[in-house]
Every structure is written in structure tokens, then in C-alpha cells.
């Protein structure tokens, strides 16, 4: 059958032609290699007939790139960009153009993956190290992570950390009544399944009588009130409870740090450091802890180690505490975080430095103080005389009139239950302040009040300690220096703009430029997530259409766009299942069946919702052992809540008996959670909702083109069948009465990056999406066919096919040569490639996923590199040299290696540095040699040393 892709080879306006790598000629050659008569025949041999989608995917006529941009302009025009002074953790900010163009809009940064291969990730690892340093300095604590999903999620994670470490046995946690409402709501969602009681009150008056394991205190408060929290923290310490402070980073440039106040943990958002509000995200949250808590810190941590030459090198530290290793015993289910946004925030600090940040903070505070003086003059005294940037006032009967007058000035005020809130930010001008006064009925001149107004920061809370003392925060004031610094870092990394990233289970496909363009338009970027809905009509039209498309693609009946990552989608999906059982009077159903091959987030997510994990065995061919499943479903029939299963399986194969698996679970009262991580092998060919699944998360940063950003942002919306729809996550701003609370701070998660997936589907259309799936499967089978004789493909279906990825097995070579999977991964760097996924789901193997976006030429380059590496292993087997002396063990080779005066190795410089097929003119050089992971964890360094350390070292 002639497809749209085949017909469009000469059509320059057809986006699918640009997105899909292989040409029609390539496809024909690849089919010959894999031994299939046609793409349709290959699909018939790969997918079980029982799950094939009957009707074609009808998503409307696909648009060209030009038409799509015009359409997005029409949607953008429906959004109204007001000056939002709403606050609640979201602020207007100015993203320096040099950072916007060279980080946010630069594929060298946004197409990279999580830095599991540290040697080729040194640039973004250094940027994240700067982020951690910035957080540690501002919070006054010892160790920070490399970002979390949002402030509310960070608060929930901190509460869980406190529960593990508190000396108090009570399962109660205190929450400051002046926290952001969305933070409290997310914490309630997290606490309820685990049986934790939240006590909300005033920490300065109510803590003494509360038996709690810890407390979250907002600094400054959501109302703007600035309180000395030291008495509350001292009271917590006396109980053996942990003190968590949610702190505003910009305010901390002027205020005493949480560490100085005695806090154990600090959390918050880095959004106002240059990251647009984006109608809710994405933004980088942070968490910092005192040293004793570092091994329980959730999320990624970047540490400093050394490479094979003893030179400094960055790496991800303390990974043994993470979900992919500890599974249901992990500190968190966090996987994807917000790396790209953390990098932007760190670069904002690098560019401005401590003096610039302090100047911005003083300006914001000054304008808030002048605003307060004017409001007092007009008869509206702020609730607190001490504040940083936010004021709360009672307006009485004039409230609605004031809000309306502000709206006429294109200003949004924060509207609380009884008070109005006015939160200023970096973008606030004197004209903005005067407009607010007019809304309150006054005609005042900013300059007159500015001359007589005093600041409102209490002397006892003023910052006296230095911050950002490391030279990196002082050396890049000019745009020239900043530009070169960012370029230097990006040159150290290997991202999709250089080469294929064949990571299995990660779907590193094209992130097309057209898809990325609207992201930075102010009509999408400058909207506050709690702005009136009528100001976001374009967004809501996009949400509605995207939700319908995703339902059509998956066979589900309803979608929630709220989850900010795949792991958070798992959490939301399991909460929906839990809510469904509870509503039916079956809250006792808490057993979650999980195959032994599952991704580590699955058991970690199940534990977070209070479920007990029971592992189901897998057969030798990688399939779920149906007999073991049936036996365990029988055993736990009265308590079975769900099964979590990935499809196609994590072994890279479509299991034939997926319908039977779903039927067994349903027959025993359970629900089927189908992990959507591998949906890129199904779109247009099969729909989870049709063959028995009840709920899935959909990785928009995999299947639907949101870039991975070096480790985030991601999005994991969930699709559900109709019976689970009432249990989708609610939110105080939209569905406050929903039976299941929110999982994210914003009601639509990271709304601004939904534009990327929307445009992708808009331009591909149903036939284009189906073709993308077919080519993804063809590409994987082509790699399997080329490599099978050199590295056996571990799992295939009964017809010898793999799905969209394959696992190759070099384990036998360790016996014959001593080579490890790590040696192969590092040697691939010398060939210019990121390694495939290592040791998952089978230790000692490599899982390869090429995606549909890679051309045959790039697939061949990768296969040639793997085959050349197999020949090098053969030389070790033949005794030419021992593995310790081989180029495999010394990989990756650096410029320092080739420049050595003496070359005392058993192979030539050319063999080591320019292996077969590697160009000498445009070779990628790893900036460091193989990183010493053991040294890094034994000598943990997670932030830049202060400048005083350099002085002491010199002495």
C-alpha cells in the first residue's frame, strides 16, 4: 500500500518527510536486510494480530510547517498577556537574550539526555554543578540536588524525607497556613495514601502543642508576610522534628538564609531566575539539606570526581539511592527532573553575579515598599509591615471594583478568600505601581513617595553572609564572555545535534525547530497559571484538541495533562486506581503486581500510593510468566489493586498474550496500568485502551517530541478509561472538589511545552504518526539484523522480530576477553556515539532504540562502530593484548592522551583515537577520560568551593 510518506518524498511541505530519517530507497534496502517483503509485512510479523488497530488514525489534515506556525499565531492571539501580580510562587522575570538564544533555543542543550554517560556530559554537568552551588550558597545548607519538578512536588518530597529521618514517632506533619495553596494541596495528595496527618496552623503560635515529625514554613509567606522563623525552628528541634523552609531565592539575596535560621531542609522554585511563567511551567524546583541528610536527598545530584588521568570530572553521584536501583525502597520515584530550566537559572546567576542579583532584589523590594506607602495613604494598610515583594490588603466592599479597575489596566491581582494580594517582580516598573494605585482609587506619583519611603526588611532578618563567591559567578559580566562560556560548555557535550543517541526506553527522536518556536513567544510564556481563564483561551483550545488527539491515539476516554514527568504520571495513574477502588468500598485492595523486568519507577510509584509490591516472574524469552501471574492473582484476589506492565515489554518485544494478562487481572478485581514509555511502537498501529488497559501515562518527551533537555523537562499526562475519569488529579484552581488531589503545582503541569507535542501531531497527522511508528520498528529490526551475528540479540518474538528497540548481549565476551559493557559504552564515545542503555532491563547488556528520525546512513555508522568494537574484542580474545592494555579499557581517548609526549600503549595513537570509520576532521573528543565513580562517592563534592578555600590552599 502506498503511504503518505512514500508519496511525499518530493513534497517539501510535508513535515513527515522531514521528521522521518530513511528515504524510500533506504526503506527498500533495509527491508531486504531484515528479510521482509514490505513494511506492512514487517508490522504483521512484529505485532500480534489481536491488538492491531482496525480503523486508521484520523486526526485531520496535517499542516505544513508554515501553516502550523500561522495556526499557532492564531492560538497565541487568543491569549491575553496581562501584568500578573498574583504571586503564589510565580513571578514575571527577564530572561537575558544571550541565555534564551544560546541555551533555551539551542539544540546542543535541549536535545541532550540525562548525563548517565558523564564523559560526554561535562558541559551540562558543570552547569548543574553551578546550580547546586547557587542553591547551597543562597540557602546556607550543605548539599543541593540538580532540580525537582516544581515547588509543590519538592515540598511533598521534603515531607517524605522528614518522615524517614525524624525522631518523632507521630505520623503528623505541620504546614504553615501561609504556604502557597497549591503546595498544601499537593502535600495532602502525597500524605493521604501513606496515612500521614497534616496539621495547618501558625508556626509561631501553634507548634508548641503539635506532636509532629516536621514542619514546612514559607519564607516569606504566600501573603507576603516576613516573619522571623527561628523560634518555630527551635521548637521543632526541641521535639526532634525536622524544619523545612520553602524560600524565595531572590529574597534570599537580601534575607538571612534558611540554614542560618536553623532549617534542616530548604525547598522552592528557581522560576524567577529567568524562566518564563509559561502558564505553569516548566520550572526547576530545588531542594537543599544539611550534610547528614544527603543520602536521602531525592533526584539527581552532580558530584565532582576525577578521570583516568586524575583530572577533575563531573558525574551523577550517590545513584544507589535512586529508583532505578532501589525500586520500591528508593527515596523517591523521581526520574526526569528539570535540567534545562535549572541550567537557565544557573546561567542567570552566572550572568548577573551576586551584585546583580542583589540589585534586582533591592529594586523589587523598593517598589513594593513604595507601593505599600501609597496604599497606606489611600487607606489600605498592608497586613504586614515586614515584607519582601508581596503585599496583602483588605479591600472590603470595594474588592470587586478594585479587581475590575486593575483588569482595565491589564493587571491581575491575587484574589484570596478575604484579601487582595499584590506581588511585584523584576518586570515591575514605577508605571505599574501607579496603575495599581489607580485601581485602588488613587492618583499618586511614584517619584514623590519614593523619596520618603523606607525599606520593610527587619534588621534581624537581613543577610550578612556572602554568597556566590566562586569565580564562575564573577567572570562573565559581558555578553561576549557569557556567550563563550556557554559555547565552551556545550562543546563538551554530545547531544542529538551531533549524533544519534540510541538509548533504549528513551526515544531520542527529532525535536523539530518548528515545534520549538512558539515556546518562547510571550503569548505562551508570559501567562501566570492562575490568571483568569478568559485570558488563556488559546491555551485552553490547545488543551482540548490535544486531549482529544491523545484519546484518539490511545483508545482512552479522558486525559489529564497535569503530571510533569513519566514518574509523576505513574503516581497519578495509581492514585486514580486507588480512588476508584475506594469509591467502590474496596480500599483494602493494595497489592500491585509488577513484572521483574519493570522500570524502577514502577515499584517506587506503587510504594508512594501505599500499595504493596508483589513481583511477577518473567520467562526466559522476557515475557511475563502467565502461570506465575495467574497464581499470584489467585493468591491476592481479595486485595489485588493493579498490575503495572510495560508494552511493548522492556525486553523490546510485543508479548503475544497481553490481552490474556489484562483479562486475568480484571478477573481478579484489579486494574491494568500500562506504562506508556514504549508508546512510540504503537501509535497508529494499536491502542492500549482497546486491548484491556485501564490507564497509562504518555511520555510526551519521548513519543511526542518534547526534548529531554539533558534530564528534563518532561511531561507524563495520563489517559484513562471512563470509569477512572472521575479520579483524575484535581487542583484548587480548577477542580478543587475532585476526589483525588493535584500531583503538580499547576493545573495543566508544564503547559508551555505542550505546544511542542501539539505542533508535532498537527504537522504529522494520523498517517504520518503511523508511518513514524512503522519506521521506528523497521530501524530497530535493521539494527538487530546487522548486529545479531556480532552481539546476539537477546529477545525476539516467535517470528524473529523486535519492536522499536532491541537488547544485544555481550555477556559471554566477558568470559572470553574480560570486556565489560562499560568498556563497550566508553569505546563508543571514541566513535562519536552516546552509548545505548546499559544493564537495563538485563544486567550486562545494551538496549538500543534508534527511533524513526535516524537515517540509514546514521544507523549504518552506528552498526559499523559496534562491529568494529567486536573486532577489537576479538583481538583481545586472540591475545594481541590483555583487556587492561586494550583501547577498550582505556576509552574514551582524549586530546590529552593523543598529545602525550610518550605513548607507552600496546596500540597506536591512531587505533586509540581514530578507530575505523572515524573522521579526523570533525571527530568529537571526550573532554575527560573515564570517570572514577567510586572516588566520586567516597569523596563527595557537590558544589563549587568558596573563594576562601582557594586562598587557604595558596597559603
From Swiss-Prot:
Its EC number is 1.4.4.2. The glycine cleavage system catalyzes the degradation of glycine. The P protein binds the alpha-amino group of glycine through its pyridoxal phosphate cofactor; CO(2) is released and the remaining methylamine moiety is then transferred to the lipoamide cofactor of the H protein. CDD domains: GDC-P. InterPro entries: GcvP, GDC-P_C, GDC-P_N, GDC_P, PyrdxlP-dep_Trfase, PyrdxlP-dep_Trfase_major, PyrdxlP-dep_Trfase_small. The glycine cleavage system is composed of four proteins: P, T, L and H. Its cofactor is pyridoxal 5'-phosphate. It holds the Pfam family GDC-P. It catalyses: N(6)-[(R)-lipoyl]-L-lysyl-[glycine-cleavage complex H protein] + glycine + H(+) = N(6)-[(R)-S(8)-aminomethyldihydrolipoyl]-L-lysyl-[glycine-cleavage complex H protein] + CO2. The modification N6-(pyridoxal phosphate)lysine is found at residue 702. One of its GO terms (cellular component) is glycine cleavage complex. One of its GO terms (biological process) is glycine decarboxylation via glycine cleavage system. One of its GO terms (molecular function) is pyridoxal phosphate binding. This is Glycine dehydrogenase (decarboxylating). Keywords: Oxidoreductase, Pyridoxal phosphate. Belongs to the GcvP family. NCBIfam families: gcvP (TIGR00461), PRK00451.1 (NF001696), PRK04366.1 (NF003346).
Amino acid at each position: 500500500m502506498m503511504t503518505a510518506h512514500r508519496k511525499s518524498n518530493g513534497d517539501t511541505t510535508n513535515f513527515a518527510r522531514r521528521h522521518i530519517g530513511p528515504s524510500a530507497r533506504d526503506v527498500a534496502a533495509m527491508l531486504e536486510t531484515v528479510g521482509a517483503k514490505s513494511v506492512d509485512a514487517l508490522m504483521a510479523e512484529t505485532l500480534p494480530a489481536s491488538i492491531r488497530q482496525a480503523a486508521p488514525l484520523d486526526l485531520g489534515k496535517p499542516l505544513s510547517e508554515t501553516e502550523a506556525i500561522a495556526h499557532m499565531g492564531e492560538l497565541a492571539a487568543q491569549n491575553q498577556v496581562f501584568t500578573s501580580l498574583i504571586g503564589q510562587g510565580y513571578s514575571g522575570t527577564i530572561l537575558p537574550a544571550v541565555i534564551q538564544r544560546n541555551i533555551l533555543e539551542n539544540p546542543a542543550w535541549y536535545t541532550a539526555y540525562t548525563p548517565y554517560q558523564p564523559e560526554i556530559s561535562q558541559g551540562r554537568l558543570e552547569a548543574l554543578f553551578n546550580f547546586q552551588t547557587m542553591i547551597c550558597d543562597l540557602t546556607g545548607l550543605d548539599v543541593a540536588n540538580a532540580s525537582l519538578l516544581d515547588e509543590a512536588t519538592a515540598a511533598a518530597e521534603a515531607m517524605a524525607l522528614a518522615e524517614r529521618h525524624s525522631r518523632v514517632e507521630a505520623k503528623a506533619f505541620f504546614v504553615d497556613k501561609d504556604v502557597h495553596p497549591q503546595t498544601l494541596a499537593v502535600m495532602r495528595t502525597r500524605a493521604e495514601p501513606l496515612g500521614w496527618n497534616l496539621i495547618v496552623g501558625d508556626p509561631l503560635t501553634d507548634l508548641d502543642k503539635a506532636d509532629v515529625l516536621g514542619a514546612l514554613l514559607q519564607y516569606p509567606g504566600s501573603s507576603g508576610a516576613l516573619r522571623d522563623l527561628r523560634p518555630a525552628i527551635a521548637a521543632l528541634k526541641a521535639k526532634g522534628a525536622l524544619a523545612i523552609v520553602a524560600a524565595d531565592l531572590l529574597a534570599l539575596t537580601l534575607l538571612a538564609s534558611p540554614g542560618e535560621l536553623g532549617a534542616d531542609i530548604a525547598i522552592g522554585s528557581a522560576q524567577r531566575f529567568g524562566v518564563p511563567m509559561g502558564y505553569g511551567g516548566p520550572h526547576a524546583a530545588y531542594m537543599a539539606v544539611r550534610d547528614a541528610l544527603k543520602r536521602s536527598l531525592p533526584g539527581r545530584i552532580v558530584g565532582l570526581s576525577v578521570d583516568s588521568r586524575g583530572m577533575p570530572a563531573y558525574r551523577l553521584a550517590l545513584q544507589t539511592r535512586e529508583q532505578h536501583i532501589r525500586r520500591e525502597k528508593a527515596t523517591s520515584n523521581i526520574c526526569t527532573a528539570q535540567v534545562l530550566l535549572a541550567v537557565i537559572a544557573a546561567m542567570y546567576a552566572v550572568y548577573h553575579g551576586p551584585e546583580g542579583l542583589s540589585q534586582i532584589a533591592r529594586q523589587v523590594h523598593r517598589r513594593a515598599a513604595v507601593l505599600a506607602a501609597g496604599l497606606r495613604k489611600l487607606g489600605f494598610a498592608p497586613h504586614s509591615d515586614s515584607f519582601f515583594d508581596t503585599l496583602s490588603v483588605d479591600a472590603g466592599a470595594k474588592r470587586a471594583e478594585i479587581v475590575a479597575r486593575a483588569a482595565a489596566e491589564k493587571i491581575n491581582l491575587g484574589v484570596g478568600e478575604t484579601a487582595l494580594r499584590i506581588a511585584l517582580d523584576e518586570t515591575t516598573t514605577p508605571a505599574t505601581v501607579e496603575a495599581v494605585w489607580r485601581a485602588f482609587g488613587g492618583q499618586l506619583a511614584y517619584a514623590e513617595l519614593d523619596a520618603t519611603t523606607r525599606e520593610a526588611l527587619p534588621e534581624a532578618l537581613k543577610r550578612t553572609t556572602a554568597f556566590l563567591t566562586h569565580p564562575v559567578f564573577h567572570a562573565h559580566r559581558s555578553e561576549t564572555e557569557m556567550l563563550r562560556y556557554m559555547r565552551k560548555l556545550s562543546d563538551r557535550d554530545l547531544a542529538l545535534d551531533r549524533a544519534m543517541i540510541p538509548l533504549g526506553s528513551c526515544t531520542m527522536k527529532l525535536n523539530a525547530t518548528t515545534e520549538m518556536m512558539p515556546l518562547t513567544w510571550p503569548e505562551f510564556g508570559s501567562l501566570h497559571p492562575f490568571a483568569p481563564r478568559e485570558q488563556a483561551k488559546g491555551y485552553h483550545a490547545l488543551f482540548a484538541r490535544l486531549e482529544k488527539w491523545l484519546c484518539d491515539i490511545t483508545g482512552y476516554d479522558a486525559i489529564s495533562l497535569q503530571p510533569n514527568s513519566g514518574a509523576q504520571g505513574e503516581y497519578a495513574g495509581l492514585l486514580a486506581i486507588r480512588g476508584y477502588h475506594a469509591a467502590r468500598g474496596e480500599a483494602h485492595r493494595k497489592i500491585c503486581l509488577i513484572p521483574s523486568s519493570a522500570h524502577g519507577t514502577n515499584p517506587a510509584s506503587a510504594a508512594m500510593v501505599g500499595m504493596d509490591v508483589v513481583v511477577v516472574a518473567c520467562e526466559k524469552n522476557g515475557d511475563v510468566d502467565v502461570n506465575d501471574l495467574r497464581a499470584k492473582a489467585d493468591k491476592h484476589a481479595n486485595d489485588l489493586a493493579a498490575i503495572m506492565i510495560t508494552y511493548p515489554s522492556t525486553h523490546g518485544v510485543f508479548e503475544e498474550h497481553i490481552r490474556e494478562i489484562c483479562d486475568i487481572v480484571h478477573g481478579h478485581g484489579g486494574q491494568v496500568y500500562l506504562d506508556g514509555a514504549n508508546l512510540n511502537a504503537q501509535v497508529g498501529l494499536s491502542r492500549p485502551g482497546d486491548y484491556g488497559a485501564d490507564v497509562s501515562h504518555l511520555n510526551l518527551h519521548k513519543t511526542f517530541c518534547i526534548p529531554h533537555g539533558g534530564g528534563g523537562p518532561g511531561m507524563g499526562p495520563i489517559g484513562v478509561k471512563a470509569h477512572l475519569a472521575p479520579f483524575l488529579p484535581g487542583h484548587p484552581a480548577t477542580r478543587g472538589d475532585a476526589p483525588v488531589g493535584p500531583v503538580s503545582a499547576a493545573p495543566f503541569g508544564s503547559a508551555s511545552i505542550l505546544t511542542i507535542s501539539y505542533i508535532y501531531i498537527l504537522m504529522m497527522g494520523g498517517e504520518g504518526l503511523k508511518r513514524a511508528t512503522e519506521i521506528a520498528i523497521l530501524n530497530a529490526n535493521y539494527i538487530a539484523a546487522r548486529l545479531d551475528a556480532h552481539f546476539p540479540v537477546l529477545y525476539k518474538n516467535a517470528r524473529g522480530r523486535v519492536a522499536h528497540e532491541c537488547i544485544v548481549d555481550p555477556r559471554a565476551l566477558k568470559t572470553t576477553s574480560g570486556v565489560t559493557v562499560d568498556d563497550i559504552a566508553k569505546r563508543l564515545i571514541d566513535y562519536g556515539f552516546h552509548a545505548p542503555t546499559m544493564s537495563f532491563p538485563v544486567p550486562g547488556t545494551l538496549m538500543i532504540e534508534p527511533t524513526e528520525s535516524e537515517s540509514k546512513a546514521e544507523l549504518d555508522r552506528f552498526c559499523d562502530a559496534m562491529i568494529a568494537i567486536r573486532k577489537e574484542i576479538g583481538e583481545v580474545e586472540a591475545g594481541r593484548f590483555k583487556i587492561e592494555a586494550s583501547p577498550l579499557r582505556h576509552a574514551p581517548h582524549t586530546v590529552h592522551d593523543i598529545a602525550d609526549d610518550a605513548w607507552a600503549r600496546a596500540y597506536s595513537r591512531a587505533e586509540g583515537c581514530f578507530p575505523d570509520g572515524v573522521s579526523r576532521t570533525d571527530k568529537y573528543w571526550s573532554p575527560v577520560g573515564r570517570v572514577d565513580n567510586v572516588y566520586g562517592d567516597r569523596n563527595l563534592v557537590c558544589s563549587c568551593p568558596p573563594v576562601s578555600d582557594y586562598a587557604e590552599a595558596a597559603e
